[in-house]
């Protein structure tokens, strides 16, 4: 008994490094056992919610102390978020679950400026974090009465099969006019920082994926929520906020014929979305998750540059990995296509395995390459998709005022983010003394850009848009075609 106790104490202090273990994410060749210690920020005697708005954990990775700061992802669900499944007689059953006290967080590592994290705290800590340029996955070990977690690099997870997995979207790399045009555009520093955009997302799960997880709706819901939380984190550098509007699970049968040809399935899904799903609830983009093995080692497909189109703002993704993170990368990849991004050319793009790589890599990144950012900027400038311009209404998202959650909420003059924001006071979410604005195409260094400066170039027969000198936003020209 004494020997067992001593071993337990030693494990709590000194991380254990193992050679191989089977986790929920698969068979991991090299991992480290850690015991995250929660550091509470609540005042003594305060009532503790089930999931706090902010949390901090300490543990060791490679012998070095790590402090993980987490903040609840406040804008992750719309206030009218709904879940739909079907009864055996075909009736549609829709519920509106309370998701305010959810368990999905984003964050960073203390003293690592380039770090990021996307963590589910529902049952232990599960997700990923970037530390000193390396992406690590973390998940709880299924040991009784233990706080043990495994930390490991993605490349240390054994492949589920040897076949290369790739996106089915193709393009001609002889033409990279989009990138050339993007570099020729006159962009202010504020425009180069990407304007804020908002995407209301609908996720549909086909019958094959439902049965794959033992027809367990709760398991499906948890997996999808983790995916969307990961997508949100990956899109943050582009200043895109993702809000999940609905989850539709085909629990009894498929409502389209899910075929092995991914583009054909995407076309059928787009038709169904236009006829059925959009009539249930307004949203900007929908993705179908399926257990179908697409032909030609394809794991996803989406239309290029069709965000906001009622039929074509869709993607189809195979649930190709037990690792939530990897499927979330594929979903983000297909979303990127809808936002005008083509595949990374390994000879032209400064990223070995970024999100828009055509083939999944052993060292898969969660970053968008410079090429992807250029494509996205060009898409925003040339196509100006309208559905993602507007933030969800203050009554549309489950949130209490909190700085840096990417939504302008009741009582806020600006969404301040970090305390270092020169325009916005992080403590009050009010503009700092002397500041006129904090964001927008007509805001530069906290001041309105003078009247008459072009803030949005014309497209086709339209006219240029100009700053008016009294707002940080770029007003639409009233004479647009």
From Swiss-Prot:
Q: Does the keyword Disulfide bond apply?
A: yes
InterPro entries for the chain: Disintegrin_CS (IPR018358), Disintegrin_dom (IPR001762), Disintegrin_dom_sf (IPR036436), MetalloPept_cat_dom_sf (IPR024079), Peptidase_M12B (IPR001590), Peptidase_M12B_N (IPR002870), Reprolysin_adamalysin (IPR034027)
Q: Where is this motif: Cell attachment site?
A: 459-461
Q: Can you give the propeptide residue ranges?
A: 21-190, 393-408
Q: What is its EC number?
A: 3.4.24.-
Where does tissue-level expression of this protein occur?
Expressed by the venom gland.
> Which terms are listed as keywords in the entry?
Cell adhesion impairing toxin, Disulfide bond, Hemostasis impairing toxin, Hydrolase, Metal-binding, Metalloprotease, Platelet aggregation inhibiting toxin, Protease, Secreted, Signal, Toxin, Zinc, Zymogen
**Gene3D superfamilies listed in its UniProt record:** Collagenase (Catalytic Domain), Disintegrin domain
GO molecular function, a single term? metal ion binding
- Gene Ontology cellular component terms for the protein in this record: extracellular region; plasma membrane
Entry's localization field: Secreted
Q: Where in the sequence is the signal peptide annotated?
A: 1-20
Q: How is the cofactor bound?
A: Binds 1 zinc ion per subunit.
**Where's the Peptidase M12B domain?**
197-392
- Top-level class of the enzyme under EC nomenclature: hydrolase
One of the protein's GO biological processes: proteolysis
Q: List the disulfide bonds in this chain.
A: 308-387, 349-371, 351-354, 414-429, 416-424, 423-446, 437-443, 442-467, 455-474
Q: Which cofactor does it need?
A: Zn(2+)
- The UniProt entry annotates the active site at 334
Question: Which Pfam families does the record cross-reference, listed alphabetically?
Answer: Disintegrin, Pep_M12B_propep, Reprolysin
Q: Which proteins does it associate with, and in what oligomeric form?
A: Monomer.
**Function, please?**
Disintegrin elegantin-2a-f: inhibits platelet aggregation induced by ADP, thrombin, platelet-activating factor and collagen. Acts by inhibiting fibrinogen interaction with platelet receptors GPIIb/GPIIIa (ITGA2B/ITGB3).
Q: Which family does it belong to?
A: Belongs to the venom metalloproteinase (M12B) family. P-II subfamily. P-IIa sub-subfamily.
Q: What else is known?
A: The disintegrins belong to the medium disintegrin subfamily. The sequence shown is that of elegantin-2a.
> What is the official name of this protein in its record?
Zinc metalloproteinase/disintegrin
